[in-house]
Each structure stands twice: as structure tokens, then as C-alpha cells.
Amino acid sequence: MITETKRLIEKDPKLSKDDLIVIGGGGGFIGGALARHFSDKGFRRIRVADKKPLPEWYQRVPGVECLHLDLSIEDNCKRACEGAVEVYNLAADMGGMGFIERFRVECLRSVLINTHMIEAAYRAGARRYFYSSSACAYNTNLQQDPEVRALKESDAYPAMAERGYGWEKLISEMFCEEYWAERGLKTAIARFHNVYGPWGTWDGGREKAPAAICRKVIAAIDTGKPTITIWGDGTPTRSFMYIDDCVKGIDMIMHCD
């Protein structure tokens, strides 16, 4: 383990193609795309971990080490992070608005993942740590006006996050901020807004709005139904991000100083 004093004064060397990159939630949509992104850039040591059995992973990248691990368990996080230079935590129990409204306890339990992963990354001597947060961390009062303005990072406070899922994200963000301030582990946080694209979930309740709308339109055409059901009245403004832009942004935010 690198000492706290050394962490605080040491300048990071450039990430080598042989440095170990660990991706929690690598069997999921964004995690799998991130593994492919780094593989395509020529990184030779990539380890991904996910609680889903391997046949259920969204995509598997040739040459990437794949571990079937439940990262809400501390020892599994230690195993996943061993030897890591950079750790990306995209593991979470989450889905679309229907899922996070119905299964708040499951969403809240994801705080265990970040608690154990960031500590395991720190103990393993990782230089940098990424956490995938969400727009649900923002104050819900900002979502009442259909003429919504672009949000700043500071708009999450005063805090009134989405119940369950949003609060889990906000407190996990605080973990990241304090690990950097107190222990010198460089952390980066991104609040995702409706990421979509190839290999994304499109049914089962965990899908986001773009995939859900596409599925409903196709089903309506197949069944001959003239209408589909959507949430809300169509007036709120929504933000969407394509998966390629998302993983590029993760890479950039982790490696900008």
C-alpha cells in the first residue's frame, strides 16, 4: 500500500499499456463498452468483474480477464482490485425510472459496492478511481419546471436527491471526495444522463427511455396497435448520451489534470 503522504505529493506517471485497469460492473452496458474502449486503445491488462454469470454479460471483450464476483462483498472487491493501477466502478443495481422507484432498497444497497471498492482500490495502491454517478443525485426540485436549464455540479446542493437511488449516488460521491481529500486517492465522478446505444438493455424494466420507446414503437408496428404509452405528458426536457461519447468522456475525465 502506498503511504498517504507519498500519495499526496507524488505526481502520477503516465498510464502504461501494461498497467492493470480494473472495471467493476464490466459485464454491464457501460462497463463492457469501457473495457472494449481500453482494449481498442491497446491496453493489455484489463480485468472486469460483475455479479452476473458470464453468459449473461452484455458483451465480452477478447483478451480481457473476466471475474464473476458480487462486488457488494468486501473480499470480492479486494480480489478484483489486487494489483490495480486504475479502478473504474460502474457496478450498481439499477435501471430505468420504473425500476428505481419500485426497488429502492436494492438501489440503496449499491452503497456497499462503492464503500468496499474504493477502500479496496486504496489498499491496493491504485493511483486513480472513477465512480459512475447519476443525474438522480441532483435536487429533485430542479426537475419540476419543463423549461429546465443546464445543471451545474453544485446544483446537487442543497441536497434533495431522488429517493433511494439518488441518495446512494450522492453519498458515494462524498466517499470519493473524502478519499481524495483525506487519503490522497485521486478520484473522478461523472453524473450520467440516459446513456444509450448498442448492447444496452431494451426490456425487463431496467431499460432507459430511448430503448424503451424504440421497443414500444416496434411492438406497436408488429401488433398493429395505433398508440403507445409513455411516461409524463411530453413537456419535460431530457438529456441523452450515446455510449461512445460516454466512454470517451470517462477516459478524458480520468486522465485530465
Predicted regions and their residues:
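N-terminal Rossmann NAD(P)H-binding glycine-rich loop of SDR-like oxidoreductase domains
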Residues: L20-K41
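Conserved glycine-rich Rossmann-like NAD(P)H-binding loop of the short-chain dehydrogenase/reductase
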Residues: F43-P53
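NAD(P)H-binding glycine-rich loop region in Rossmannoid oxidoreductase-like domains
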Residues: V64, H68-V111, A120-R123, T140
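Conserved Rossmann-fold NAD(P)-dependent oxidoreductase catalytic core, especially the SDR/UDP-sugar
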Residues: N89, T115-E162, A188
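Short-chain dehydrogenase/reductase
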Residues: C107-V111, A161-E173, D203-A211, S239-F240
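Flexible, glycine-rich beta-alpha linker
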Residues: A137-N139, G164, A188-P210, P236-T237
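Active-site Tyr-X1-5-Lys
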Residues: M160-H193, A212-T223
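Alpha-helical substrate-binding/gating segment
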Residues: A181, V195-P198, P210-I228, R238-D257
